[in-house]
Amino acid sequence: MRAVKGRTHISIARFWGAGLLFSLLPGLLLPAVGVAAEGSSPQPVAQVAAPTDLSPEEQATIAVFDRAARSVVFIANTAMQRDPWSFNLFEVSQGSGTGFVWSRQGHIVTNYHVIYGADSITVTLADRTEYKAKVIGADPDHDVAVLQIQASEATLQPVSIGNSQSLRVGQKVLAIGNPFGLDHTLTTGVVSALGRTIKSMSNRTIEGVIQTDAAINPGNSGGPLLDSGGRLIGVNTQIVSPSGAFAGIGFAVPVDTVNRIVPELIKHGKLIRPGLGISLVPDAMARRWGVKGVIIGKVGRGSAAERIGLHGARETAGGRIELGDIIVAVDGKPVESIDDLMDSMEQHKVGDQVTIEFARGNRRMQATATLQPVN
């Protein structure tokens, strides 16, 4: 969700400002209008209601916003383009989004799609100071990216980290972001559903996604979804809308996933995944051949898969292609697609042992593999 610059809103504000000025001019030119004439009966004066105290819920929401808004940043993404006639390079806005301060070392977390294709990224803090940012690491499969700015620790307020495992449908949530370029906009809602799946830019499935009805619009991408205590529970990433504007269904990558990925991106610049060291036949081909499971295309030399004797596809002496082993389960959990296999791997870390169940011809076999780091 990329937002456009808020020029329309500015021009509307000016229009309404001008209209208000003109509507006041008659009163300025005719000061007697509305003033009681001498000797006439006094006109009733409207009574202004006394201010009422805010409810405890309102006070709590205000306190959360005041505390968390300092962690939320505005991200502008620009790219360089060459004029086809003059061959001069010039900057073109790619859009804008939201992010939040992760650490006092200047790490900023946002969505990968917010900074995709950027040649230059500008981060604006809550105090309006601007910094050029560099990309430290990105994981397109989970739509997460980490930036870094050179700002003093005193100016950075990291967001408070919560957890997403204990979330309940119906609990209150708050979203802070920059929809349509309108910075630090607060919206509230509830957790509408848990355990949703969405597709990332790389067409990978993101599991365990939070669904919310807190308004999320273009420009909110990469912003924090908070619980009622102001703790981060997700990163706003997508909406379902036929018009492109909010229609009551928004999605956030759960914080437990983010909290696993971000330290890896800061340390390595990419997500180090556990795996078997194999390449796989696309799901579409497996379905076409009527295969249920994931077909191994090639086994890497010295890989975890080779060490347990898994076979890839091979050409027979007669020139016929023989399918590789078909992975059908990991630790007893069925595997029917590449996404299923990768999701199973992501539940573990490098060095963990997993039980691989696979089919070879008419035989069903099992082996225990020690997971290795893979790209």
Residue ranges and their predicted role:
Residues 108-109, 307-338:
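Conserved PDZ fold ligand-binding element
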Residues 17-31:
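Bacterial N-terminal signal peptides
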Residues 1-12:
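N-terminal secretory signal peptides that target proteins for export/translocation
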